Amino acid sequence: MKKLLMITAMLALPLAAGDSHAGPDLSAPDAFAAASAGKVRLIDIRTPQEWRQTGVAPGAGRVDFHRGPEVLLSSVLQIVGGDRNAPIALICRTGNRTSHAQKFLQAQGFTRVYNVSEGMAGSAAGPGWLKRELPLESCAQC
C-alpha cells in the first residue's frame, strides 16, 4: 500500500504543476544514435520481466519504475554519477511511464531529461524500438 501511495504521489506531482508535457522527446533511432555516440545515457525504466521478454538497448541503464520514486531518483543519480545536468533519455514500453518519470526527474533538478516517447513497443509517437529493429542485448539474468 505504501508503495502504491508513493507511485501515486510521484505521478501526481507533475500534474499539479499543470504541465501536460514535459518535453523534450527523442525518437527511438535518435536515442540510439545519441547513446551510441556517448551524447546521452539511455535508461530503461520497464520491469525486469519486460527486460527479459524483449531484451534491452545496448548499454542502457535499468531502473524498475514500479519500485517507487526514491529508487528511481537514487538509481538515476547513481547511473549519472550524481550529475543532474547529464543528458539522459528514458525509455519504457510505450512512453507513458517515461513521461511521468521525466516530469518527476525534472522536478528533482535534472536539466536534460529526454523521453523516448515511442518506447520499445511503439505508440502514437512512432513504431518503437522493437519494430524499428534497433539493436538489443539479452537480459536473461535481469
Feature map (PLM): residue ranges:
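Short hydrophobic beta-strand that contains or immediately precedes a catalytic carboxylate
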Residues: 41-45
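Bacterial N-terminal signal peptides
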Residues: 6-16
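Short, surface-exposed ligand- or partner-binding patches at beta-edge/loop junctions that are enriched
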Residues: 91
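Rhodanese-like catalytic fold shared by cysteine-dependent sulfurtransferases
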Residues: 18-37, 48-87, 98-142
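Positively charged n-region of N-terminal signal peptides that target proteins for export
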Residues: 1-4
